[in-house]
Amino acid sequence: MATRSPSVVISDDEPGYDLDLFCIPNHYAEDLEKVFIPHGLIMDRTERLARDVMKEMGGHHIVALCVLKGGYKFFADLLDYIKALNRNSDRSIPMTVDFIRLKSYCNDQSTGDIKVIGGDDLSTLTGKNVLIVEDIIDTGKTMQTLLSLVKQHNPKMVKVASLLVKRTPRSVGYRPDFVGFEIPDKFVVGYALDYNEYFRDLNHVCVISETGKAKYKA
């Protein structure tokens, strides 16, 4: 049985932090309930994940595959930490990047209908160590679909890093190899996670309010 990937577990009754304790853009002041994961904590956890990735995958050229759009902030910060490790290590490895865009959400619900609406030719992944970087695993269906697409091209290794994994009864049971935080079944935004394209410009991961859902509903 595979070992469960470690993560920072945020409990169901976690109260979060008052918005007025942090710098929040004024245009979102009424649209959020609370700050759930402050930006500094995200960065510290991401730094450790970079070390874990290098320890497990650092023996061979890595292709880092970013799942757009929500994964781009985590992707950029994770790669910055990996590059820093590369610069300061006797054993550095080459790394290239690629991008794919998937869509499975309308409003705050994962539709289960996975659309690949961007990305380069995945045949370039053949024989490579592939690190897929995602913002959040909700039901897990999106990632299972992407993994099946990637594995058709016979990569040497495929690992998945996700900033967040949601505890939800809708989960198919999939868990990535590298996990930042395990969170309750709440719809979170910020740090590039969106609600119908809004809130990507927040630094912190926050819980959206009912007012925010109504205002930005598709």
From Swiss-Prot:
Give a Gene Ontology cellular component term annotated to this protein.
Answer: cytoplasm
Gene3D superfamilies attached here? Answer: 3.40.50.2020
Q: Which residues bind GMP?
A: 69, 134-142, 166, 186-188, 194
Is Cell inner membrane among this UniProt entry's keywords? no
CDD domains in the cross-refs: PRTases_typeI
The catalytic site is made up of 138
**Which InterPro entries is this protein grouped with?**
HGPRT (IPR050408), Hxn_phspho_trans (IPR005904), PRibTrfase_dom (IPR000836), PRTase-like (IPR029057)
Renumbered to this chain, the signal peptide range is none
| Molecular-function GO terms, alphabetical | guanine phosphoribosyltransferase activity; hypoxanthine phosphoribosyltransferase activity; identical protein binding; magnesium ion binding; nucleotide binding
Instruction: Tell me which residues bind Mg(2+).
Output: 194
On this chain, the residues bearing Phosphothreonine are: 142
Work out whether the entry's keyword set contains Iron-sulfur.
Answer: no
| E.C. number | 2.4.2.8
UniProt keywords, alphabetically: Acetylation, Cytoplasm, Glycosyltransferase, Isopeptide bond, Magnesium, Metal-binding, Nucleotide-binding, Phosphoprotein, Purine salvage, Transferase, Ubl conjugation
Cellular localisation: Cytoplasm
Q: Which cofactor is recorded for it?
A: Mg(2+)
The annotated crosslink position for Glycyl lysine isopeptide (Lys-Gly) (interchain with G-Cter in SUMO2) is 115
Glycyl lysine isopeptide (Lys-Gly) (interchain with G-Cter in SUMO1) cross-link position in this chain?
A: 115
Indicate the principal place this protein occupies in or around the cell: cytoplasm
GO process terms (BP): GMP catabolic process; GMP salvage; guanine salvage; hypoxanthine metabolic process; hypoxanthine salvage; IMP metabolic process; IMP salvage; positive regulation of dopamine metabolic process
* Family stated for the protein in its record: Belongs to the purine/pyrimidine phosphoribosyltransferase family.
Any idea what job this protein has?
Converts guanine to guanosine monophosphate, and hypoxanthine to inosine monophosphate. Transfers the 5-phosphoribosyl group from 5-phosphoribosylpyrophosphate onto the purine. Plays a central role in the generation of purine nucleotides through the purine salvage pathway.
Protein name, please? Hypoxanthine-guanine phosphoribosyltransferase
- Tell me which species this is from: Sus scrofa (Pig)
Protein's gene: HPRT1
